[in-house]
Each structure stands twice: as C-alpha cells, then as structure tokens.
From Swiss-Prot:
Record's subcellular location: Cytoplasm
Stated role: Responsible for the release of ribosomes from messenger RNA at the termination of protein biosynthesis. May increase the efficiency of translation by recycling ribosomes from one round of translation to another.
Keyword terms of this UniProt record: Cytoplasm, Protein biosynthesis
One GO CC annotation: cytoplasm
GO terms for MF: ribosomal large subunit binding
Official protein name in the record: Ribosome-recycling factor
The keyword Nuclease is annotated on this UniProt entry: no
PANTHER family membership: MITOCHONDRIAL RIBOSOME RECYCLING FACTOR PSEUDO 1, RIBOSOME RECYCLING FACTOR
GO biological process, one term: cytoplasmic translational termination
Length: 185
C-alpha cells in the first residue's frame, strides 16, 4: 500500500520536472534551436497542422534556422504562421527553403525571459509540493483507518519528503542552467 503511494508520487514528481524542462526548452535563447518552432501550427488545407509535420527544421548556423517545406505550395502559409507567432521572428524565402534569422536578445528581453523561466520554476515546485501533499494525505488516510502504524506513517512522510527535495533540486538545476544560457552573450 505505502510502496504504491510512494511509487505513484515519485512518478508524478518526475513528470512535473520533465514538464518544466519541456516548458523552458521552448523559451528562446540567443542560439538557434529547432525546438523553438515546435509550437507553431500552420493551416494546411483548412486543418491546423504542427509545422514539424509539414517541414524539416534544421540549424543552419548559431543564429539561423532553415526550414525545408515538404509541399512547396505551403511555403507562404508557413512564413505567415511563423510571423503570426509571438516569437518575433521574420522568415525569408530562399528558393525552396525558408530561412529564419534569430535577432540577438536585448538585455531587457533577457531579463524578461529570466523572470518568465523563474515563474515556470515556481509553478513546477508548487506542482511537486502538491504531489507530496496528496501522497501524505493518502498515507494519513491509511493511518486513520488503522491500516498502518504511526511509525510507518512517519517513515513514509520522510521518504516522500526526500523525493520532494530531490525533485525540487532537479527543477532548481534546470532553472540555473537555463538562466546561465539566457545571460550568455
């Protein structure tokens, strides 16, 4: 019983950490990364379709992404979708490819992005703590039903706290890495 609760809590905490890492990977840094365009959706014959299903995105150099659209007639629609996104990018057609130069980040924009990333980190920490609370509540319910002893309850809470501390350390480490990446010139 208790081991199931602990395993469930551990899996859920790990999912919180992974969701945070995925979220901050979408925040633009000074370097080009294909994942930057993951959230872009293009109207493909009346159907909203993710860009990665319509084209391949590669890094041409440290500040330029190259998009090779599979259906050449979709080039203008892809450009329009990139411009409509809130990424502040201006794509340009070059024959069969679309190039997306990444403008350098200003100091002010770097600070704004750092604030956003810190907010995401706090949300991840809160999510991890909520998982801890749920696990502890389930264990307390077992104690109340006299299915476990007080020693088991205390031991379980200590283990859940250790898992919580480990998950929060992972969030903090990912946050520190992203902040360092954002502040590089």
């Amino acid at each position: 019983m208790i081991s199931d609760i602990r395993k469930d809590a551990e899996v859920r905490m790990e999912k919180c950490v992974e969701a945070f890492k995925t979220q901050i990977s979408k925040v633009r840094t000074g370097r080009a990364s294909p994942s930057l365009l993951d959230g872009i959706v293009v109207e493909y014959y009346g159907t909203p379709t993710p860009l990665r299903q319509l084209a391949s995105v590669t890094v041409e150099d440290s500040r330029t992404l190259k998009i090779n659209v599979f259906d050449r007639s979709m080039g203008p629609a892809v450009e329009k979708a990139i411009m409509a996104s809130d990424l502040g990018l201006n794509p340009s057609s070059a024959g069969t490819d679309i190039r997306v130069p990444l403008p350098p980040l200003t100091e002010e924009r770097r600070k704004d992005l750092t604030k956003i990333v810190r907010g995401e980190a706090e949300q991840a920490r809160v999510a991890v703590r909520n998982v801890r609370r749920d696990a502890n509540d389930k264990v307390k319910a077992l104690l109340k039903d006299k299915a476990i002893s007080e020693d088991d309850d205390r031991r379980s809470q200590e283990e859940v706290q250790k898992m919580t501390d480990a998950a929060i350390k992972k969030v903090d480490a990912a946050l520190a890495d992203k902040e360092a990446e954002l502040m590089q010139f």
